[in-house]
Design a protein with these regions (language model features):
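Active-site acidic/histidine proton-transfer and metal-coordination neighborhood
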Residues: 60, 76-177
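Active-site beta-loop-alpha junctions enriched in small/polar residues
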Residues: 8-12, 34-38, 70-74, 104-106, ...
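Catalytic-core regions built around general acid/base machinery
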Residues: 47-61, 127-135, 167, 198-202, ...
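N-terminal pre-domain/capping segments
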Residues: 1-97, 177, 283-292
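Hydrophobic residues within beta-strands of alpha/beta enzymes
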Residues: 31-33, 99, 142, 210, ...
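Aromatic/hydrophobic pocket-lining residues that form the small-molecule binding cavity
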Residues: 16, 47, 51, 80-87, ...
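Histidine-acidic metal/acid-base catalytic patches
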Residues: 1-4, 13, 17-27, 95, ...
């Protein structure tokens, strides 16, 4: 078993006993499951029912749990803060150790709209402080993720990994860390012509979780057979795209945090092959590079 390696359950799927057993047999130690929508987290009753069923499914395995918050959850309003509080209840009931959260998920803007963006981001940050205090009391870490555009389009504040890292540092909470998504980093670094290894190195001390998947960067007219011709965030298996794994493996391999694979089902090889190849690219090669 690869103690740091995990695999996502697709947001539309339920982690059945057979699915979880297959993950464990392939060598994964972690599983990521998406929570119900915001409204159900706010309402509590249905959310907790879902969480308890998830815990029951996991109890027959040795898999450790990470839950992914709803993509549209952004602390900073009464409605969203209530849902975030329900998210913490959900994670505790399900026995999750980590929550993946999309912080700073606001469109970039100029002029008067820029002031509104700053205000909304400040409201989120203010709300996260007591929510993180509660997360800490529950033994849960909230990992805030750098994102990337699914298709070419408007930039969002969360597309800047350093902005996400700086939010984590300002929060200064033992229950807050960065979720460094390597696939997203590849897209945004390619778009800005930045060095992904340098950005990764600047963020590494604050990372509590990695997401790993591959893509073709911001594409720049690059195409490949068998994949969507215009999508950026392809979620290919590691090694199937153009992400420079050899340049990031040293930092990832030397880290102690989990590495969660998020691979689109239509591109996914056999689970044992996916686990072995991902471990070779990231964990084993990275550990060797760190020791050299």
């Amino acid at each position: 078993m690869h103690a740091r390696l995990g695999l996502n359950v697709h947001r539309d799927a339920w982690p059945t006993t057979a699915v979880l057993a297959a993950y464990e047999a392939a060598g994964f130690a972690w599983v990521q499951v998406h929570t119900p929508p915001r409204a159900m987290l706010s309402e509590r009753r249905q959310g907790l029912r879902h969480a308890r069923a998830l815990r029951t499914a996991l109890d027959g395995t040795g898999l450790r749990l990470l839950v992914h918050a709803p993509d549209d959850l952004s602390a900073g309003t009464i409605e969203h803060d209530r849902a975030f509080d329900g998210l913490l209840d959900y994670a505790a009931a399900a026995g999750a150790e980590l929550i993946a959260y999309h912080g700073l998920n606001f469109a970039e803007a100029d002029g008067p709209a820029a002031a509104r963006l700053r205000e909304r981001a400040q409201l989120e940050e203010r709300s996260l402080i007591p929510l993180l205090q509660r997360a800490h009391s529950l033994g849960i870490t909230v990992a805030i993720e750098n994102l990337a555009p699914l298709y070419p389009g408007q930039a969002r504040r969360c597309h800047d990994p350093l902005a996400v890292r700086d939010l984590v540092r300002r929060l200064d909470s033992p229950a807050a860390g960065m979720l460094l998504d390597l696939g997203h980093l590849h897209i945004t670094a390619d778009a800005t012509r930045s060095d992904p290894a340098a950005v990764l190195g600047a963020c590494a001390p604050d990372v509590a979780l990695f997401h790993a998947h591959d893509n073709l960067g911001c594409r720049r007219s690059i195409d490949a057979p068998g994949v969507d011709p215009i999508k950026l965030d392809l979620h290919l298996p590691p090694g199937r795209g153009t992400l420079p794994w050899a340049r990031v493996a040293g930092i990832v391999g030397a880290h102690r945090t989990p590495v969660m694979l998020e691979v689109e089902r239509s591109y996914r090889p056999a689970l044992d092959v996916l686990a072995a190849e991902s471990a070779r690219l990231l964990l084993l090669a990275g550990s060797a590079a760190a020791a050299a």
